[in-house]
Amino acid sequence: MARITAEDCNKIIPDRFRLVVLATRYAKLLNYKVETNQIKKEKRDKPPVISLRRIAAGKVSVEQLEQDLINSLRTKTMIEPIVNQDESEDIEEKFEYLPEVCITEDYSDLDDQIFIDETGDDFEDK
């Protein structure tokens, strides 16, 4: 972050951490708009520098940028509740073809197995 630009931005957004998060969000938006040809690419400046300069100049609404950031972090999908019990029973019927051997809670066969640790060296579980 350029020191002069960051110091100018501190007048608008006193918290540096908040400034970094908001400037990053705005830089990502700028980068997206440049890639989709919605705005012209400014010469020699990268999106983070442009976003800091625009925040320092007051050309960007900080409140709107915060709200945009919050909306982008929210979960987009909703979990649908199970309306009737018959649907869950249908799911159980889909797994009836599996033999009982596959559906077990017995892990005693793991005692004799060989495992590989993260370094790639073999070792036996004892």
From Swiss-Prot:
Gene3D superfamilies cross-referenced by the UniProt entry: 3.90.940.10
Catalysis performed (reactions): RNA(n) + a ribonucleoside 5'-triphosphate = RNA(n+1) + diphosphate
Keyword terms: DNA-directed RNA polymerase, Nucleotidyltransferase, Transcription, Transferase
EC number: 2.7.7.6
GO CC annotations, alphabetized: DNA-directed RNA polymerase complex
BP-aspect Gene Ontology terms: DNA-templated transcription
GO MF terms held by the record: DNA binding; DNA-directed RNA polymerase activity
Disulfide partners: none
Similarity comment text for this entry: Belongs to the RNA polymerase subunit omega family.
Subunit structure: The RNAP catalytic core consists of 2 alpha, 1 beta, 1 beta' and 1 omega subunit. When a sigma factor is associated with the core the holoenzyme is formed, which can initiate transcription.
PANTHER family given in the database record: DNA-DIRECTED RNA POLYMERASE SUBUNIT OMEGA
Its biological purpose: Promotes RNA polymerase assembly. Latches the N- and C-terminal regions of the beta' subunit thereby facilitating its interaction with the beta and alpha subunits.
Protein name listed in UniProt: DNA-directed RNA polymerase subunit omega
